Amino acid sequence: MQTQIRLSRDSSIRTYGMRASAIPYRTEIERSLSSGESVVIDFAGNDVTQSFVDELIGALILKEGRQVVSRLAFENCTNDVKGIIKFVVHDRV
């Protein structure tokens, strides 16, 4: 089974920048992963900072190990977002 996490819950937010704003999403991801599901993170219409992605994905890698990345998929990422995700994954793996 697969869970989809959409970052665009609040239309007033275009850029997710603070680490604290990633925690509720990471908690939701952790809950899905612990249930044996894979997770698709949908970045549609949103920009993110490295701090946000590190708290969202980097913290998961530190906690669960590098294999957690194989259970995550990313959708609707701009080139900038893709670059940030790649940097964080390589930094934490």
Predicted regions and their residues:
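Amphipathic alpha-helical interaction surfaces in cytosolic regulatory modules
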Residues: 12-38, 42-90
